[in-house]
């Protein structure tokens, strides 16, 4: 296996796929661009801001706590990490899903973002 990252079966509907750094970066760039566009569209409807730069995305909420979600790649382990709702979500690539997935639940990046935005805002959000 390349990069020491092993593909393994999980309890979710998908298994993760090993990849080298170049392939990870390519897939991550595509996923981040799609996520940025979809978050901006959702933000226009639901009243949150999306900022990007330095290889990460931030979702900013206009609440008393100035809550923010941070989405960033973690290249050494070939994962996308999301810090939100006092939790760190770690998503790995799945060829079967054609997306980064949270192994624990089987949610794709877009599905997970929709769920945690819905939890934060208290109304349904689709990403």
What is each residue range found by the language model?
Residues 1-18:
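N-terminal mitochondrial targeting presequence
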């Amino acid at each position: 296996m390349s990069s020491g990252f092993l593909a393994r079966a999980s309890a979710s509907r998908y298994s993760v796929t090993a990849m080298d750094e170049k392939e990870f970066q390519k897939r991550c760039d595509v996923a981040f661009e799609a996520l940025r566009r979809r978050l901006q569209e959702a933000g226009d409807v639901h009243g949150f801001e999306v900022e990007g730069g330095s290889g990460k995305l931030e979702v900013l909420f206009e609440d008393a706590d100035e809550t923010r979600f941070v989405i960033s790649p973690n290249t050494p382990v070939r994962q996308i990490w999301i810090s939100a709702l006092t939790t760190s979500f770690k998503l790995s690539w799945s060829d079967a899903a054609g997306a980064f997935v949270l192994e624990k639940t089987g949610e794709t990046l877009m599905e997970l973002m929709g769920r945690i935005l819905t939890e934060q805002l208290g109304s349904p959000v689709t990403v």
